[in-house]
Curated annotation (Swiss-Prot):
It comes from the Viruses. Pfam families: Orthopox_A47 (PF06334). This is Protein A47. Belongs to the orthopoxvirus A47 protein family. InterPro entries: Orthopox_A47 (IPR009402). It comes from Vaccinia virus (strain Copenhagen).
Amino acid sequence: MGNKNIKPSKENRLSILSKDKMDSFKRGSWATSSFREKSRATIQRFSSLRREHIKVDHPDKFLELKRGIYEIIQKSSSIDVDKRTKLMSNIKTMMINPFMIEGLMTSLENLDPDNKMSYSSVMILGEFDIINISDNEAAFEFINSLLKSLLLLNTRQLKLLEYSISNDLLYAHINALEYIIKNTFNVPERQLILRGQYLTPIFSDLLKYAGLTIKSNILMWNKQFIKPVSDLYTSIRLLYCVTV
């Protein structure tokens, strides 16, 4: 009976208080840990749903473009170094006058394999052993594709490319165009910063004559430029393929 009124000693009170704090800490730690796990799971589920919601299932336009160009380039594999040199020399001469390229295209389309005299009108292929063209149809198709790609460009672009060939600038143009294509083709609009090697005067003019606008060093992109940029990129890639 008397024990009920006995107060715990100071040491016992400290021990009890310490035990209560530890129990509270453990409960708090468990609650915090449980909350974190639940929160983490919720965030992961939300992130997963968000990724599924914003995922856009569209083809990569750049890969499609490169694939088509690669198929054309493969047809040039049988053209040896000497013939490539002669072909490029003749094309450079004709690039200054697009009407010559157009006339050549007409000659190629109307070419009669059974009439050897008709070959004389195809001057650009005069050094290509054209009489045996039936044995090298792939090379013939490559040249045809190259000329068609050049006809899609305007006179100013052709003259700039003729200068670029003479000054070994085609590869630099390819790198700059690929930088632009990778950063623009899959978006409708964008302001793309061009720096250093991507902002040379000649390359800027090639873009300007394709219809694009560059303010200071910022390219004002719109999806309507996909075709003219694709045409420019294709022609430069095919021209570079012929260089030796």
